[in-house]
Amino acid sequence: MVRVARSVNARKKRRSILAAAKGYRGQRSRLYRKAKEQVLRSLVYAYRDRRKRKSNFRKLWIIRINAAARMEGVTYNRFLQGLKLANIELDRRSLAHLAVHNPDTFSALVGVAKDSLKNAPDPVAAARLRGTSSRT
């Protein structure tokens, strides 16, 4: 019976793991077993953080919009409510970009939002007229 030589495949696998662990500190870049454990852990981190990046950017956009809106004298919540009442559908990414790069355009949007908030009917008063509570 012919002997199965696996050294070529094993060496190739070890080389690829150690190449992936290049730049890690200490034993994790030199010893195969430690490198393999760390590379697998790193892949898990990368998978998780690719999803986390989306929520991090959303948080950043909200912070930027809120800061710019407060400089105009309105909170983030009221600003978005005013935009919704004015039927302006801009996503948070675009609003944050405008807040940072085009402050004049952003303040015009804040003005539109404030006007629509002034002209909007009060939901609490409307609920009282109907005889129902707006809070459940």
UniProtKB/Swiss-Prot annotation:
Keywords: Ribonucleoprotein, Ribosomal protein, RNA-binding, rRNA-binding
Family: Belongs to the bacterial ribosomal protein bL20 family.
Single biological process term from Gene Ontology: translation
SUPFAM superfamilies to which the protein is assigned, alphabetical: Ribosomal protein L20
GO CC annotation, single: ribonucleoprotein complex
Function recorded in the entry: Binds directly to 23S ribosomal RNA and is necessary for the in vitro assembly process of the 50S ribosomal subunit. It is not involved in the protein synthesizing functions of that subunit.
InterPro entries: Ribosomal_bL20, RIBOSOMAL_L20_CS, Ribosomal_protein_bL20_C
The protein, known as: Large ribosomal subunit protein bL20
Molecular function via GO: rRNA binding; structural constituent of ribosome
